[in-house]
């Protein structure tokens, strides 16, 4: 089967476009738009898609015909997910649970991949619902300790 270079390159190109667009969206305070970028990014990392606890393997290989179709009819570059495949079933399931909660702006893998963690951007009034959904639909069914960490962002790096 070999190394699937096409899907990895497409992921990288899409990530560059999403990074550029993400900065613009944050400056415009367009959090829903930024959240969609987080979802597209995770779709490029994912290996599985979950619905009601059931997993489906994601096949994001790109044939010549797929690439020609993307060029001719495809969505904008920021929506091209490619396939980096650095997620795992556990992170994919957590991401899908989080993204299904009303008030979750966008969730996806962050960190090293094949481990890492899921970061969810959530409206303040939906935090409790998201934590409960993750506990109820992921941690408890897998007999795992409940392990959500709620944080608030700051302005970022600055000179003190």
What do the PLM-derived regions correspond to, one by one?
Residues 111-118:
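Small/polar glycine-rich anion-binding or flexible loop at a beta-alpha turn
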Residues 1-108, 120-160:
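C-terminal nucleotide
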């Amino acid at each position: 089967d070999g190394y699937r270079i096409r899907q990895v390159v497409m992921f990288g190109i899409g990530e560059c476009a999403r990074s550029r667009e993400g900065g613009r969206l944050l400056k415009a305070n367009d959090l829903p738009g930024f959240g969609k970028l987080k979802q597209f990014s995770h779709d490029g990392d994912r290996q599985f898609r979950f619905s009601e606890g059931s997993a489906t393997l994601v096949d994001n290989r790109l044939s010549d015909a797929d690439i020609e179709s993307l060029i001719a009819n495809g969505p904008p570059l920021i929506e091209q997910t490619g396939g980096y495949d650095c997620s795992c079933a556990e992170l994919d399931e957590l991401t899908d649970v989080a993204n299904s909660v009303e008030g979750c702006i966008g969730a996806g893998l962050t960190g090293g991949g094949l481990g890492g963690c899921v970061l969810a951007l959530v409206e303040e009034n939906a935090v409790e619902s998201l934590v409960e959904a993750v506990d109820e639909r992921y941690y408890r069914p897998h007999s795992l300790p409940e392990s959500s960490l709620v944080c608030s962002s700051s302005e970022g790096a600055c000179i003190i």
